[in-house]
Each structure stands twice: as structure tokens, then as C-alpha cells.
């Protein structure tokens, strides 16, 4: 029986890139992974020399003496970047090291074990790739493990509850810790925007609010310039909190028409605004287009935790912002309608969000 409120979206089953790299001595990239359609936009490696990517200090954000100035910085980061690094978030670094180690162990399980967690036909959760809608579609050079974590009744019974111990308990705690961080950030955003709690905070602090996780594994590639680890896109959710699992860089964000490599700070989270928050804020806060690139020598791993509005809630521009700005820039629709449209498409920059503009 399908869990209450759950909906079925699917992605076509594809081979494991990790296994393909492990089993064969690959010197050239298989045709289905060659991305001649890749964005050839210049990569600006010196960007951080000219201007600093925003860094938000959680401790200052929560202190009565420094809150106002840090909320201003947060507001600027969300308006001008849609992206920032979060330091002093309060989650113990030794616990985060445990999360990272167990994610690596999970991807290194024997294939026979991993098959238990593989995507099933007509489902999108599990090991595999997402947004694969046709057999001739070009694929990313990556494996991912995607699953819903909250609310508990939306968990697939063959996924989260069956994860090996202690990994399952570790992820349970990580889910709770990151959710607390996300709720604080969203509350501070609402403060900066001067909008009512029910227009933003309460949408993400509700029994129906959805939290999901995607663990990403990007194997080394003999021709890294021929492939893409993660297709350029903006996140379709409200807020994303990303943690780099190992020390290999590969995340790039698009700023002022150029791809900017992100250099993660030690023990920091990378936080980005998703399309749903752009809709709710009527375009005041902007989701950011980003991609993952790979290299020829080392694997890269990360974990993204997505925070979103409940499935049958309606989303649209906050009424108080529409009244202030005299215009609604996006359509109103339920999250189910939003996701039905989303999962019928391939990833393509911010094209889906653009289709919802008025």
C-alpha cells in the first residue's frame, strides 16, 4: 500500500557508472555519456580573488547582539547570489566526519548489496540517476542515492528502514540536525523579507513538510572534459543544504554569466535557494544554476539535503510581497502539480521555473 501522501514519479533505470569504472579499464567515454551539448561558458577560476562568495555565520545569526547585521548579510546573499557558505552551524565536526565516512562505506558496498537499494521501475528513489525520461538521453557521469526522509510515513519501506546500521541511525540524526539548521535559516529569511510566518516559515515547519536526501558519487573519468557529473540546473525545492563528503572539488555556480568553482570551507555547509523559495519570495530571492564537474584522478562525493513544502500545500508568491511589489511574478499551484510537471522533464537550467512565470 502506498504511503499516505506519497506520489509516484519515475526515472528510467540506467547502469551504475561506479561499477562501470570499477570493472573495466576505460580509456574513452561511452557515447551515451559524451556531452557535446555541454555549456562551453568560460570558467572563472580567479572569481574568488575579485569578490568573496558570501559566508554566513550561524552563531552571529542567532545572537541578539549581531543578528540584525548578519540577517542583512543573509538577505544580500539570497538576493544577489542565491547561495552562501554557512559556518558555525553548531553541528559537531566529529559527528560530520562520521557521516562522511559512512557515506563512503555505503557507496563502496558490494554491488549485490547495493542492488537491494536500486531504483525500481516507476520509482525515482534509490540508487541510480534522476530526470532520465528517454532511452536516448545523455547521462551524467555519476551515481546517486535519493530517498525521502521526512515525514516518516513517506519513507520507502525498502530504502531508509533497510539501510545498514549504524548508517541508518547516523542519517536519522543528521536529518534532524540539518532540518533544525534549515528551519532557523528560513525563519531569518522571513525576518529579512518582513513577511508573515504563515507565508514562509510555517510552510516549512509543518508535519507535512518534506525533507529528502541525495548522496552523490562522481567517479574519476579518463576524459573529464567530455562529460558532466551533474547537469546544470537549479534545485526544484525550497532550500538545499549540501555537505562535501571528501576533499575533491567539483561544484560550480553560475554567476554573472560565468561558471565559478566553489571552494568549500572546512566544516561549512553550502546552502542554496531553490525554485520554490524563488516562487514564494516572488523573485526577491533567486535560485542559482549550478553543476558538478569531474576529474581524471579522484572520485568526488557529497550529500545534499532538500527541504520542501508539503505535497498538497499550495505555493505561490507571498501575498504581502505581491501587495508591496504590485505584481505576482509566478503562478500558484499545489506541490503535487509542481512535481508532476517537474519529473516529466529533463534537467535544463532554470527552464521549469521560467515556465511558471506570469
From Swiss-Prot:
**Signal peptide residue numbers:** none
Which positions bind Fe cation?
233, 235, 290
UniProt keyword annotations, A-Z = Iron, Metal-binding, Oxidoreductase
Domain Fe2OG dioxygenase: residue ranges: 209-309
- Spell out the SUPFAM superfamilies in the cross-references: Clavaminate synthase-like
Q: What's a Pfam family in this record?
A: 2OG-FeII_Oxy
Do you know which InterPro entries this protein is assigned to?
DIOX_N, IPNS-like_FE2OG_OXY, IPNS-like_sf, Oxoglu/Fe-dep_dioxygenase_dom, Plant_2OG-oxidoreductases
Induction trigger: By virus infection.
Q: Which cysteines are joined by disulfide bonds?
A: none
Tissue expression remark: Low expression in roots and leaves.
Please, which domain of life does this record's source organism belong to? Eukaryota
Q: Which GO terms describe its molecular function?
A: metal ion binding; oxidoreductase activity, acting on diphenols and related substances as donors, oxygen as acceptor
Q: Which GO terms describe its biological process?
A: leaf senescence
The miscellaneous comment for this protein is: Unlike the homologous protein NCS1 of Coptis japonica, SRG1 has no norcoclaurine synthase activity.
The UniProt similarity line reads: Belongs to the iron/ascorbate-dependent oxidoreductase family.
Q: What is this protein called in UniProt?
A: Protein SRG1
Q: Which organism is it from?
A: Arabidopsis thaliana
Q: Which gene encodes it?
A: SRG1
Amino acid at each position: 500500500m502506498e504511503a499516505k501522501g506519497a506520489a509516484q514519479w519515475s526515472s528510467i533505470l540506467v547502469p551504475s557508472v561506479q561499477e562501470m569504472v570499477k570493472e573495466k579499464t576505460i580509456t574513452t567515454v561511452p557515447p551515451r555519456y559524451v556531452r557535446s551539448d555541454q555549456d562551453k561558458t568560460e570558467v572563472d577560476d580567479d572569481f574568488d580573488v575579485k569578490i568573496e562568495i558570501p559566508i554566513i555565520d550561524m552563531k552571529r545569526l542567532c545572537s541578539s547582539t549581531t543578528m540584525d547585521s548578519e540577517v542583512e548579510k543573509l538577505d544580500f546573499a539570497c538576493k544577489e547570489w542565491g547561495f552562501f557558505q554557512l559556518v558555525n552551524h553548531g553541528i559537531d565536526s566529529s559527528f560530520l566526519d562520521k557521516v562522511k565516512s559512512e557515506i563512503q562505506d555505503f557507496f563502496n558496498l558490494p554491488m549485490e548489496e547495493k542492488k537491494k537499494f536500486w531504483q525500481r521501475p516507476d520509482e525515482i528513489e534509490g540508487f541510480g540517476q534522476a530526470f532520465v525520461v528517454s532511452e536516448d538521453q545523455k547521462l551524467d557521469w555519476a551515481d546517486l542515492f535519493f530517498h525521502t526522509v521526512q515525514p516518516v510515513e513517506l519513507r520507502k519501506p525498502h530504502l531508509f528502514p533497510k539501510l545498514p546500521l549504524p548508517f541508518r541511525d547516523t542519517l536519522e540524526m543528521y536529518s534532524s540536525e540539518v532540518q533544525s539548521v534549515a528551519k532557523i535559516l528560513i525563519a531569518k529569511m522571513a525576518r529579512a523579507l518582513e513577511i508573515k510566518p504563515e507565508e514562509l516559515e510555517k510552510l516549512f515547519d509543518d508535519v507535512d513538510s518534506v525533507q529528502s536526501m541525495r548522496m552523490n558519487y562522481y567517479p574519476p573519468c579518463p576524459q573529464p572534459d567530455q562529460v558532466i557529473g551533474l547537469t546544470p540546473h537549479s534545485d526544484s525545492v525550497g532550500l538545499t543544504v549540501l555537505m562535501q563528503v571528501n576533499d575533491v572539488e567539483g561544484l560550480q555556480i553560475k554567476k554573472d554569466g560565468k561558471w565559478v568553482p566553489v571552494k568549500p570551507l572546512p566544516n561549512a555547509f553550502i546552502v542554496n535557494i531553490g525554485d520554490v523559495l524563488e516562487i514564494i519570495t516572488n523573485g526577491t530571492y533567486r535560485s542559482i544554476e549550478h553543476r558538478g564537474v569531474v576529474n581524471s584522478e579522484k572520485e568526488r562525493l557529497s550529500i545534499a539535503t532538500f527541504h520542501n513544502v508539503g505535497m498538497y500545500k499550495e505555493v505561490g508568491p507571498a501575498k504581502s510581497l505581491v501587495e508591496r511589489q504590485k505584481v505576482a511574478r509566478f503562478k500558484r499551484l499545489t506541490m503535487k502539480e509542481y512535481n508532476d510537471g517537474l519529473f516529466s522533464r529533463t534537467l535544463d537550467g532554470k527552464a521549469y521555473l521560467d515556465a511558471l512565470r506570469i
